């Protein structure tokens, strides 16, 4: 029963987070946003989901049918697993819970790449390969960030009593940048936002397949914001920092232009990694 309730809460969170995103983007662009569907637009995401679920499924003739259908399901499964495990208090308080979280994040890289390859489309393959390269490179930084509490405070659980963010603001900013890159959010949405990619790895997906990838992406955003708020802001109200992170993700999309691919790589190799390595040397050896 716990798993069913948590999955329903995950879907509702994604639904209303998308509504919040459309409202924030509309207000930043001096527009109104959804306001016609029942209760002044509150039920708009539910109506959109129902419409997409009843659309027909198109299978490209050159695609791998097994991976084409399995990839969206696997992507959503990994994202929901992150969401479920966060609310399982017995799990997150055990040793090495951060490593298990990193394992799920690492595995979640493969479904979009397999989806791009299985679609049989040049645009999908190119988008899937870019998504794989981008996320794998930023996972190195994510690994260092999430293991930082181990080196500094000798603990490796998500729920901790230490307040890290009070003197490690650089680590928190780095985590936010990695969050945007790992979840393909602006300004790092290069796997599906570039003109030559059409829609990236999910170009050939519509209806239910698109819904599953959509739910997986937003569920991963919410999960990573929850983990970041618990890991770095335990001395403060966790939900305040959690909602602040969600709003910052939306404001970044509305205010920051998309970066070039070379700038994406330069940030990781010349800014984030050297800075974090210097912090590790400072806290561990000094």
Predicted region positions:
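Core, highly hydrophobic multi-pass alpha-helical transmembrane subunits of bioenergetic inner membranes
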Residues: 1-286
């Amino acid at each position: 029963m716990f798993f069913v309730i948590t999955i329903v809460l995950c879907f509702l969170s994604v639904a209303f987070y998308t509504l919040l995103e459309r409202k924030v983007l509309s207000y930043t662009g001096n527009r109104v946003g959804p306001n016609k569907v029942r209760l002044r637009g509150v039920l708009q995401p539910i109506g959109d989901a129902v419409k997409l679920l009843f659309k027909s499924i198109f299978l490209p003739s050159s695609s791998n049918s097994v991976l084409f259908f399995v990839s969206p399901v696997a992507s959503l499964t990994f994202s929901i697993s992150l969401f479920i495990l966060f609310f399982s208090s017995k799990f997150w308080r055990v040793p090495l819970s951060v490593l298990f979280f990193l394992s799920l994040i690492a595995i979640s890289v493969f479904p979009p790449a397999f989806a791009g390859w299985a679609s049989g489309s040049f645009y999908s393959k190119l988008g899937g390969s870019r998504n794989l390269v981008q996320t794998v490179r930023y996972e190195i930084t994510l690994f260092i960030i999430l293991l930082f509490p181990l080196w500094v405070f000798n603990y490796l659980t998500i729920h901790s009593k230490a307040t890290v963010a009070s003197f490690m603001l650089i680590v928190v900013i780095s985590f936010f940048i990695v969050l945007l890159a790992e979840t393909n959010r602006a300004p790092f949405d290069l796997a599906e936002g570039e003109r030559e990619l059409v829609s990236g790895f999910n170009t050939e997906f519509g209806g239910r397949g698109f819904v599953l990838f959509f739910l997986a992406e937003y569920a991963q955003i919410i999960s990573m914001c929850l983990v970041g708020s618990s890991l770095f802001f335990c001395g403060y109200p966790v939900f305040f920092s959690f909602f602040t992170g969600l709003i910052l993700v939306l404001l970044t999309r509305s205010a920051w232009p998309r970066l070039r691919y070379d700038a994406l790589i330069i940030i990781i190799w010349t800014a984030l990694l050297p800075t974090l390595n210097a912090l590790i040397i400072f806290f561990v050896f000094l």
